[in-house]
Amino acid sequence: MRFAAPLVRATLIKRYKRFMADVRFDDGTEVTAHVANSGAMLGTAEPGMEVWLSPASNPERKLKWNWELVTVDGHLVGVNTAHPNGIVAEAVAAGQVAELAGYDSIRREVKYGVNSRIDLLLEAEGRPKCWVEVKNVHLKRGDWAEFPDAVTVRGTKHLAELTDRVRAGERAVMVYLVQREDCAGFRPAADIDPVYARTLAQATRDGVEAICYTCRLAPDGIDLGAPLTMDLTERI
């Protein structure tokens, strides 16, 4: 995925109201940027951090900038949760996700379940449908990438709906996309949301597949990185 325009560096002043952040550009100008992330953003939204912004594509929008990346301990981390679906879709189409190869059709935002939309629906003649849910991961604790960074009732609901697809004889895959490169493995944040962690463990026992990939990040774009080891052991 390429950014439409080069990102501009700034310094984070503060994030507030979840979707807003005040930043200061290198020339001293201060603006309020849009934050496309409803999570807690633990460890990625501390005042003084170096951040990278993209200009809004709509010139009429009130907030003229989008917060895309943040530098944490010398590593770029993606914080815009609007990108993972597109990154994964591009990678699947290019044959870069071995676990999701061999499908002729990729559809996005297809209705299913109870008032839900699946991120990707993969189809091919003679094969069961493959329902793919993508989750953005940016939380790191120790050497582990973890999800979620806040309680996610919606995420737990998605796992139940994926399990229903497996019971219907179809394929369901949970993709955790880690928007950083400095993690040794992935695991659920069981202390933050024990219900989600337990539901994920049960879903995988019931046939839902779970895979995890990192991202390669740069100020000009974000690409799929390497697969990451997963530990889905129940801890709570």
From Swiss-Prot:
CDD domains reported in the protein's UniProt record: SfsA-like_bacterial
GO molecular function: DNA binding
Similarity comment: family membership: Belongs to the SfsA family.
NCBIfam families reported in the protein's UniProt record: sfsA (TIGR00230)
Protein known as: Sugar fermentation stimulation protein homolog
